[in-house]
Amino acid sequence: MMQRDRWFRCRLSSYQTHRLPPPSEDSVPIATMERTPGLLECEHLNMHYVSEVRSIPSCAPFVVLQEWPMWWDMILSKWEKHVCKIYMRVCVCCATINVDFNQIVRGFERWTIHCHCIKPGSLQCKAGGVVLANWFKMMIYGSLYNLRFPWYREIVNCGMPKEVLFMGSVFVRGRHFIYIRLLYDGHAAIVLERMSFGWSFFSYGIMNNMVVLGCTYCKNLDELSVRCCARRTRRLLAKAVKVLGSFTVRSLMRSLVEPRRQGLLRGLMERYCPFTLADYNRGENPWRA
């Protein structure tokens, strides 16, 4: 039976303490469609659930995606990487959530965490589930970046099409992770082949194509640095839209549902106002070619 952590025993201070040094230039990964060494893709044949972690309202941008990818090598210390490599087998998208039961996002859903070890149910597997849940809590509280800077998404997504949009941010151990969703598989292949996002990785998830960018420029969390980071992210999205525009027949129009989505997310994070997935996805047809 997988373990459930109903309440956080302590609040992890993912903003100031236990900061990681900047990544070395020799080992910086770059998002590509090819298989990245050390990056384990999710395989449904051998996955099994090991724990659950309760969400908070600032995780709402990821709850609507119903999955939360993260390459753990980017946020773990050297010793934690050793433990993860030797005793655990964790994929890039080990946290999923199911909100289809009642179609309502309240901000306190439970994220289900799975692993791919060869001994499901063993003591080592259960212990790894507890460790993985504690690591995932850093991401849960790192999502408070979305509540502290709610205008970040407004700046980046202003006038952007639905095919390329910024979804949310996570701040863990002095590192800022920026989540960009590429709506279609073909668009993801075109963009990743023709441009570089720098320190990043690509997640071909169960339901989403996500490019996760790493940033250390805004590690002090001052408004000036964060606004510069937002403008840099917007320039990358604009470049991706330009690349897609040269390979698509129809023009990419700005997303009409994005302003309303921003209002729903801010209402949940700031005033605890729940919303339904029907309201969030209204007016968007994901199967349109």
Swiss-Prot record:
Record-linked InterPro entries: Adenovirus_E4_30/34 (IPR007615)
Pfam family, one: Adeno_E4_34
GO cellular component term of the entry, any: host cell cytoplasm
Superkingdom of source: Viruses
Keywords on record: Early protein, Host cytoplasm, Host nucleus
Subcellular location: Host nucleus; Host cytoplasm
Keyword Transit peptide: no
Subunit structure, as described in the record: Interacts with E1B-55k.
Function of the molecule: Plays a major role to prevent cellular inhibition of viral genome replication by nuclear bodies. Assembles an SCF-like E3 ubiquitin ligase complex based on the cellular proteins ELOB, ELOC, CUL5 and RBX1, in cooperation with viral E1B-55K. This viral RING-type ligase ubiquitinates cellular substrates prior to proteasomal degradation: p53/TP53, LIG4, MRE11-RAD50-NBS1 (MRN) complex, ITGA3, DAXX and BLM.
Family per record: Belongs to the adenoviridae E4 30 to 34 kDa protein family.
Protein name, per record: Early E4 34 kDa protein
